[in-house]
């Protein structure tokens, strides 16, 4: 990613929240596929409207906020765009939602995990955001915005063959696979590799085994210890036939040889497949700016 955009810098500092889980059985994400998709489309339109800005037409931004935002998100956006609106230079900021998946959907409330790309004067930036939106008078309005989110997962449904149970089993499997794939320790490179190999299958496993020596040496030379951040985020982009594609986000905690810890936001897609009582990854696609 090239130079970070002011909007993304402000979002990161101003809009991180914890969130809450919904009761078991209350999460209809992908269970009611049609309404889930419609809610995601509405949140996408709202997010792109209120996270874009043209200094030549500031009234359009105010109108977008009035139409698409409620609750805490109003103050978050005011704080977010304060610096942008005061810029002495012309600003033409365009935001688009690259990917989005529902974390939870209850009919009148949706929380989704979205990858945003912002472009301004040839510069682009990427951020992963959790949006909460409420259905108000037939219209979906953003009520909370969290960039680089760390929020607890909704209460899982039983893995009983239902769509909700399959979804939550796949998400738990994806989080477990991510923990093995993206957690490394330069003082134990062989163990780090072994943990990763144990959670992959298919051509990805073949690739790991073919490059084992390279992976182990790279981990050893890194001189770091990498762990997932608290409350990693996972949402299903697609689900069916014992397979799922999952959008995953965490702020990796990277500890260097001197003990200094740096947070590194990390977003990826994971393809996972059921393998007996567990789930294994068949593909890993880190999300980067276009």
Functional labels for PLM-detected ranges:
Residues 16-22, 196, 206-214, 220, ...:
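A broadly structural signal marking compact, well-ordered functional cores
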Residues 86-123, 220-258:
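Surface-exposed, charged secondary-structure patches
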Residues 124-158, 245, 265-290:
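Short beta-strand edge/turn micro-motifs at domain boundaries
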Residues 70-78, 82, 96-105, 110-111, ...:
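Intrinsically disordered, glycine/charged-rich N-terminal periplasmic/extracytoplasmic linker segments
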Residues 40, 50, 69, 102, ...:
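A compositionally biased, intrinsically disordered/low-complexity signal enriched
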Residues 2-45, 111, 127, 146-183, ...:
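Juxtamembrane and targeting peptides
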Residues 81, 116-118, 146-149, 212, ...:
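A mature extracytoplasmic/lumenal domain signature
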Residues 31-86, 162-221:
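Core segments of small alpha/beta cavity-forming domains
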